[in-house]
Amino acid sequence: MTDKLIIFDTTLRDGEQSPGASMTRDEKLRIARQLERLRVDVIEAGFAASSNGDFESVQAIARAVKDSTVCSLARANDRDIARAAEALKEANRARIHTFIATSALHMEKKLRMTPEQVLEQARQAVRFARNLVEDIEFSPEDGYRSDPDFLCRVIETVIAEGATTINVPDTVGYAIPELYGNFIKNLRERIPNSDKAIWSVHCHNDLGMAVANSLAGVKIGGARQVECTINGLGERAGNCSLEEVVMAVKTRRDYFGLDVGIDTQHIVAASRMVSQTTGFVVQPNKAVVGANAFAHASGIHQDGVLKARDTYEIMRAEDVGWSANKIVLGKLSGRNAFKQRLQELGVQLESEGEINVAFAKFKELADRKSEIFDEDILALVSDESVTSEKEQFGFVSLAQHSETGERPEATIVFTVDGKEVRSSAEGNGPVDASMKAIEAHVRSGAEMVLYSVNAISGSTESQGEVTVRLQSAGRVVNGVGADPDIVVASAKAYLSALNKLQSKAERVAAQG
């Protein structure tokens, strides 16, 4: 009988720490539902004590998710742990993930605590958490760079206090696969009660080895949980990629001898949803979910695949959710067909009202574009105006005038707290003019640090997906907008970023 590998997804917590990847509550809820559809074992929904916004997100996900365990991060103190437990109280299965740094560098420079103080705080934190929920995960932050003798003492102590999962993170992505695997193995062999907990790995990708290190922790170290994110999203160079580690274990079951419960046919839908929500475009050559992952340009490769797919393909594209028939709907498609396709794509809107709004936008798009692709639909439902979440700024219409040799002018109509306003401005181009028209009224003072355009599908009538990254007062957010008209898409993206900037400011104010 094979062991099961537990998949712990932290897209909504650690993934959101990517600069600009800030998500609203409703966006997190949609992704959580997709993760549940993917059959992720544990969803780390956020850090409940960090802000009122994060608390509400964790609480909403705990209420909505029925099959996956819902987890909240908490520092090793009573306030954080109690706040996490409160946010999780309506979850079918709840987990508190508490942590404290154990490396000499972190204890001295960041915590300013002695090892004995850290040991005692870890003990008290797990004891307190165990009285609130049964499922407790403990992480020694910067565990891989910690003194092994001290780490053994800490882990033995927290297991004795009731920790059910021990996660050993490579917090800064410093590890090498063989060394990391043996590090986990040695800890498990040295700690007398190590068999009383499930061992977990959490690897960052600073040296490009997050997946390799995680797999070494499983194969060599005996870990049975991997912490990962969709598309490898995460701060700095990112985290271990869920799709890569899952497909590695499934494709090389002969080597790993493990089962995973993931429904892999929903992987691509999850990847697209996270990409379009955060504005982080998946690189074409990304393993499993990149546009070129199953493409063969070489004539020799193409000939081999046509004769026998397994000559050059080690897994089937359809097994991870790639569809051979990419054209799905048109202007004659009805509401039921649209609703069914949403379900097939893993999209679950909150209410019939939201479906009606989304369908109206679909019909509007179908009148302008003859072929509607899956990517078009996902971009459409990612639009903030589809969801019930309150938005301060909303796009209404845009008119532009541009002639060779003259400065373009744009006039935009948009809503501010539900009231329509009209603003005009000139710019160096129509996109610049439209954004200056918005700023002429809003006066946010935000600095644009990124502007990018991505064609959603391959034709000339494709929707353009625009990502705008704004920075203000130390806050960085991404806004995403899609439309066949690039200027309109740009205006939508700018307004989306302003909404997130406002939301993040409110969360910071609430936290303060």
Swiss-Prot record:
Compartment(s) where it occurs, according to its Swiss-Prot or TrEMBL record: Cytoplasm
Record keywords, A-Z: Amino-acid biosynthesis, Branched-chain amino acid biosynthesis, Cytoplasm, Leucine biosynthesis, Manganese, Metal-binding, Transferase
Pfam families: HCS_D2 (PF22617), HMGL-like (PF00682), LeuA_dimer (PF08502)
Binding-site positions, Mn(2+): 14, 202, 204, 239
An example Gene Ontology molecular-function term: 2-isopropylmalate synthase activity
Domain of life: Bacteria
Disulfide bonding pattern of the chain: none
One annotated GO biological process: L-leucine biosynthetic process
Region ranges (Regulatory domain): 394-512
Location (main, coarse): cytoplasm
Assigned GO CC terms: cytosol
Enzyme's top EC category: transferase
Function: Catalyzes the condensation of the acetyl group of acetyl-CoA with 3-methyl-2-oxobutanoate (2-ketoisovalerate) to form 3-carboxy-3-hydroxy-4-methylpentanoate (2-isopropylmalate).
Family membership noted in the UniProt record: Belongs to the alpha-IPM synthase/homocitrate synthase family. LeuA type 1 subfamily.
Subunit structure: Homodimer.
Protein name per Swiss-Prot or TrEMBL: 2-isopropylmalate synthase
Annotated organism of origin: Acidovorax ebreus (strain TPSY)
Higher taxonomy: Bacteria, Pseudomonadati, Pseudomonadota, Betaproteobacteria, Burkholderiales
